[in-house]
Amino acid sequence: MAVYVVDHPLVRHKIGILRMESTSTSEFRSVSNEVARLLIYEATKGFRTEKHTVQGWAGPVEIEAISGKKVTVVPILRAGLGLMDGVLDMIPGAKISVVGLYRNEETLEPVEYYVKLASDMDQRLAIILDPMLATGGSLIATIELLKRHGCRQICSLNLVCAPEGIAKVEAAHPDVDIYTAAIDDHLNEQGYIIPGLGDAGDRIFGTK
């Protein structure tokens, strides 16, 4: 398993905006998608391309097009929806799969309540979207669900990760790579990332 921290001035600046308590719901939502665009840029660096000759404005021209890669974007409801538009801006042809999980606030374990996956999961790269990788429970549950449906190419996009969550995912699924904007210090007793962003789902959707 590889963990890629996308260390770029724009990413650091935008994560700083997301950390601010004063950031409005609309700004939090838009900046989350901006960071998602930067993360997906890094996550797709390994895509292969093929050369084609097409008709350009001044005659035939050789171009490169992505080849041999079927993608499904997998937002974990509900917070993962806050990254989806940014990713789809860059990969508009991706299919959307949806996994609904919520965290039991007493046990901190994920509870599954909805699943709708794209077809041919065994042929697709699944890009899981979840703003916060905290305990790792939701991500591990989603990875296991995808693997049960035949998916073998999986990576995760997260705005912020906790070291504890990364360690759990690595132990359970060492074949899954993680792309993140930041690795924070630790989890508190309630399972929230410190310093973190707060509850990303509430901040994206304007709820408490």
Swiss-Prot record:
Gene Ontology molecular-function annotations: GTP binding; magnesium ion binding; uracil phosphoribosyltransferase activity
BP GO annotations: UMP salvage; uracil salvage
Cofactors (names): Mg(2+)
Alphabetical keyword list: Allosteric enzyme, Glycosyltransferase, GTP-binding, Magnesium, Nucleotide-binding, Transferase
InterPro entries in alphabetical order: PRibTrfase_dom, PRTase-like, Upp_B, UPRTase/APRTase, Ura_phspho_trans
SUPFAM superfamilies: PRTase-like
Cross-referenced HAMAP family: Upp_B (MF_01218_B)
Function text: Catalyzes the conversion of uracil and 5-phospho-alpha-D-ribose 1-diphosphate (PRPP) to UMP and diphosphate.
Protein name from the UniProt record: Uracil phosphoribosyltransferase
Species whose genome carries this gene: Desulfovibrio desulfuricans (strain ATCC 27774 / DSM 6949 / MB)
